[in-house]
Amino acid sequence: MMLPFNLQQWIEENRDLLKPPINNKNLYKQAGDFIVMIVGGPNARKDYHYNESEELFYQLEGDMTVYAQIDGKKEEITIKEGEMFLLPANIPHNPVRPENTIGLVIERVRIGTDLSDGLFWFCDKCNHPLHHYRFPLTNIETDFLTRFKEFYASEDYRTCKNCGDVMEVDERYV
């Protein structure tokens, strides 16, 4: 069991860990039921995370935006400093954090469950689905990187079958 600690002090001492490209740190790696992460900005990811369980966002410093794919449309949800938001399960979402922002995110642990994760990309021009992965999540700090690299290495994956637009390569992942 981990003893109580001062979260603000932890953030001050560990800001250097909350940097691109993914910017998150799991605070309770041995927890059995929940992933409790501190996430920093800026981030510039274009993928949409898919989680078969709810996610709780609590914005500690600065404001952020969560883009969500709802009924085939890109919706924008703003979470201001001090606000919290419970994202329902099964909604592809892209949390966008500007520079100098910090948030707390709580998700269910998926190891030992039949829940899977996903990463989805949508066309910047017409919002048509480009490519997606579904996979069992074992380590929230590292499992996405392999899929990012594979997606950005493939022009076919990045090319919209609807309008022909090609998503730019994110150089951090090639």
Q: Model-derived features: where do they sit?
A:
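A short, N-terminal "cap"/entry segment at the start of jelly-roll beta-barrel domains
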Residues: 1-40, 45-47, 146-174
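Conserved metal-binding segment of the jelly-roll/cupin
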Residues: 39, 78-99, 107-108
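A short beta-strand-loop-beta hairpin characteristic of the jelly-roll/cupin
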Residues: 50-81
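Structural motif
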Residues: 63-65, 102, 129
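Residue-level recognition of conserved beta-strand positions in structured domain cores
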Residues: 68-70, 97, 105
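A short hydrophobic beta-strand segment most commonly corresponding to one strand
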Residues: 99-118
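Short cysteine-rich clusters marking metal-coordination/redox-active sites
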Residues: 121-126, 160-163
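Short Cys/His-rich "knuckle" micro-motifs
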Residues: 130-137, 168-174
